[in-house]
Amino acid sequence: VLSIVDLLEQWCVDRAAAGQKILGLCAPPGSGKSWLASQLQIRLSVASLSLDDLYWPQPQLQQYQRGLPGSHDLPLLKQVLADFRQHGKAMAPCFVKGLAAGAGDRQGQRPLVGDLLLLEGWCVGARGVPTLQPYQAIWQQLDGLLLLRPPSYGRVMRWRLQAEAKQRQQGGGALTAKQVAAMVLAFYGHLPAEKCFAPLWQQPQLPTWQLQL
């Protein structure tokens, strides 16, 4: 039986063979997007960029709720994607969630080099509410989109709590259970799954594949 990493690897190989360069990965908070991307980097010439790395630095980030539309530096993200498409490499900021008492902040940069660039995030590709409109120019730069669908959106809370617990064990700042609950409720209150995510597989606007988690 193929693992989800095996399936993702084959998907990337097929997309690269089709001449695609920049792919999107949309999956719920705490579902292991960054871990999956890191596994692909071991197996393939894939550069991985998290939408989280494009959060505004402090203190600008304090004007937004982290993770919601508006909290990302879209002009910089657009430039990073354009550089990668043109040159096969780019420089991207690093966002460390354990800084600023768990609120997170930017810390340095890192190179993106590979045959493919995977942009991963919980709302990559999403549409359907006005606050997502500025993001559509970003999504239009994607050659394809993979959706990892949770068995239920109630499972997302548990996954996010586990992710924060792991971050705490590693010595970084982490959100409390109350803060996690508020964050996840805000995420799906602001971007309802039925309105912002269901259309991605029901009425796709770019080549789209999906896997059930």
Where are the regions that the model predicts?
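Extreme N-terminal, non-catalytic leader segments
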Residues: 1-24, 28
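Short loop/turn elements that form and flank the Walker-type P-loop nucleotide-binding site
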Residues: 18-19, 111-113, 140-141
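Anionic group-transfer/hydrolysis microenvironments
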Residues: 26-28, 54, 122, 151
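Conserved lysine of the Walker
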Residues: 33
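Hydrophobic positions on the alpha1 helix immediately C-terminal to the Walker A/P-loop
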Residues: 36, 40
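Conserved nucleotide-sensing/catalytic segment adjacent to the nucleotide-binding pocket
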Residues: 47-104
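Charge-patterned, long linear interaction tracts outside catalytic cores
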Residues: 106-124
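Conserved NTP phosphate-binding and transfer environment spanning the P-loop NTPase/kinase superfamily
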Residues: 116, 123-213
